[in-house]
Swiss-Prot record:
GO terms for molecular function: p53 binding; RNA binding. Belongs to the CARF family. There is a cross-link at K177 (Glycyl lysine isopeptide (Lys-Gly) (interchain with G-Cter in SUMO1)). The modification Phosphothreonine is found at T340. Residues 168-216, 234-248, 270-280 have a biased composition (Low complexity). The modification Phosphoserine is found at S124, S234, S371. Residues 19-126 form the XRN2-binding (XTBD) domain. Residues 249-262 have a biased composition (Polar residues). Keywords: Acetylation, Isopeptide bond, Nucleus, Phosphoprotein, RNA-binding, Ubl conjugation. Pfam families: XTBD (PF11952). The gene is Cdkn2aip. This is CDKN2A-interacting protein.
């Protein structure tokens, strides 16, 4: 056929000159040879009869010629570059190109053909045949190993760290450091007024004092001043109990506010004083017994006889004593705060969140009667010892404190609507990247391909590693003790889990399982039940449209921490 076209053009030099003007700049000979045949087959009466008519073409003929040239270029792009156009355009150019034989055209595989081929062949779900990632990926994995190791450690220590983080009181105050009598002193420079401290049952209630000598303001509001008179009686008992220890160790000054404590071991961990601009306040956790190890409140442990912890704050204009106690959700944990007295006149006020009986029980919790301690305001008596270390509670309060480390909320369809558009775009990106590498195969670096597709959409692939022996929801055997489990997530949505002898191998397996989802017709985000430390939790999981989630792998981290 090429010979026939060449003979025709040699016999008609005018037509050859005209069609040569339609050649694109930089077009290869192979492309032009076939496109020229396409033009000559469909030119018809567009070929000028004489040179004069070629120079004076009408507007209609010009538009028809431009349309023909466009069709010829679309056909050449489809044949040689694999481009596809709307179905009407494809039908038109293929019908116009009937009879043209292209023997040296490259073979292109479309995404639909690739997916159909993979479905027909079938995909093995076993973990065998997974090749190790390249050395480049291994180096990157080592660079990120420290971060990934932290994820594993934090997952195992969630319950222990939760109790320690919730022990401190919500009151705050800014302080400056000074030295007095060879000991470290801490003075409160300015206190920020606290609006509310009783919003939750498991948090302690904090009290504040005003600059007025006759007014006491609590964290929960001024309405608590009018509590029942029997609470005043309990407060008076507390005042008389603490007054004798206070007189020998607290120094008062109208101009200077000072506080003395142990240099190292007597460091304060309890709640600090929170006051308004012209007043100050001293907070003292309640007295406990050193002989009882299981008392469920911040105990006062004895150190050496030479270590004492005391602090006193005096105000310029007001030095009225204010003793307040805060009782948390557990009836065994409580605290008190004390202001310095003015001219031996004491006006205490006791604030509790439960009942007076609970406060009295916690104040008198000295089973052995060995010693009394004070944490921030009172030093020990001559034979007693005190320090400020706090022990975390070992009762059910630990579970309640760990449960508020992150606010658990129920997943809804709104969460799915927020995540689904991103994964629709990721589906298309992964599909084109699979076409670029020749399709899904064991030789492809699945982790690198998945990470590149996610980074192309300005997102991050989250990777978590945990030793297999730390998962309580999987069977244990001798051969799997050293295996590593890897979980992949993106946008707080679970993608897949893999297990291997090393972190790189586990990540490669997880990436391959995640990529299998994108070989289906559509991916959807669903709310599914998963195991986490023996209990069922809700999680956002990426699945294909027809999949029914059964026995999903256990979660390595709680999903609520990642939302």
């Amino acid at each position: 056929m090429a010979q026939e076209v060449s003979e025709y053009l040699s016999q008609n030099p005018r037509v050859a000159a005209w069609v040569e003007t339609l050649r694109c700049e930089g077009e290869t000979d192979k492309h032009w040879r076939h496109r020229r045949e396409f033009l000559l087959r469909n030119a018809g009466d567009l070929v000028p009869a004489t040179d004069e008519t070629a120079d004076a073409e009408s507007g209609a003929r010009t538009r028809q010629l431009q349309q023909l040239v466009s069709f010829s270029m679309a056909w050449a792009n489809h044949v040689f570059l694999g481009c596809r156009y709307p179905q009407k355009v494809m039908d038109k150019i293929l019908s116009m190109a009937e009879g043209i034989k292209v023997t040296d055209a490259p073979i292109h595989t479309t995404r639909d053909e690739l997916v159909a081929k993979v479905k027909k062949r079938g995909i093995s779900s076993s973990n065998e045949g997974v090749e190790e990632p390249s050395k480049k990926r291994a180096v990157e994995g080592k660079n990120n190993s420290s971060v990934e190791r932290d994820h594993g450690k934090k997952s195992a220590k969630t319950d222990r760290s939760a109790a320690q983080q919730e022990n401190s009181s919500p009151s705050r105050g800014s302080s400056t450091k000074s030295e007095s009598g060879g000991t470290s002193a801490r003075s409160s420079s300015s206190g920020s007024h606290q609006d509310s401290a009783t919003s939750e049952g498991d948090r302690s209630v904090c009290s504040q004092s005003s600059s007025n000598s006759s007014q006491v303001t609590a964290g929960s509001g001024k309405a608590l001043e009018s509590e029942a008179p029997h609470k005043r009686g309990s407060a008076s008992f507390v005042s008389s109990l603490l007054k004798s220890s206070m007189n020998s160790h607290m120094t008062q000054s109208t101009d200077n506010r000072q506080q003395s404590g142990s240099p190292k071991k007597g460091a304060l961990e309890g709640s600090s004083g929170s006051a308004s601009q012209s007043s100050s306040e001293i907070e003292v956790p309640l007295l406990g017994s050193s002989g009882s190890a299981e008392v469920e409140l911040p105990l006062l442990s004895c150190k050496s006889s030479s270590e004492t912890a005391s602090s006193g704050l005096t105000s310029k204009s007001s030095s009225e004593a204010n003793i307040s106690s805060s009782v948390s959700k557990n009836s065994s944990s409580s605290g008190s705060s004390l202001l310095t007295p003015q001219s031996s006149s004491t006006n205490p006020s006791l604030l509790t969140s439960k009942s007076t009986a609970q406060v009295a029980a916690s104040l008198l919790a000295t089973k052995s009667g060995a010693s009394l301690g004070s944490v921030s305001q009172l030093a020990a008596k001559s034979g007693s010892q005190s320090s400020t270390s706090q022990l975390p509670s070992k009762s059910t309060s630990q579970a309640s404190e760990s449960s508020v480390k992150f606010a658990c909320r129920k997943l809804t369809n709104e969460d799915i609507k927020q995540k689904q558009p991103f994964f629709n775009r990721l589906y298309k990106t992964v599909a084109w990247k699979l076409v670029a590498v020749g399709g899904f195969s064991p030789t492809v670096n699945h982790g690198e391909l998945l990470n590149a597709a996610i980074e192309a959409l300005k997102a991050t692939l989250d990777v978590f590693f945990v030793p297999l022996k730390e998962l309580a929801d999987l069977p244990q055997n001798k051969s799997s003790q050293e295996s590593i489990v890897c979980e992949l997530r993106c946008k707080s949505v679970y993608l897949g889990t893999g297990c291997g002898k090393s972190k790189e191998n586990a990540k490669a397996v997880a990436s391959r399982e995640a990529l299998k989802l994108f070989l289906k017709k559509k991916v959807v985000v669903k709310i599914c039940k998963r195991k986490y430390r023996g209990s069922e939790i809700e999680d956002l999981v990426l699945l294909d449209e027809e999949a029914r989630p059964v026995n999903l792998p256990p979660a390595l981290k709680h999903p609520q921490e990642l939302l």
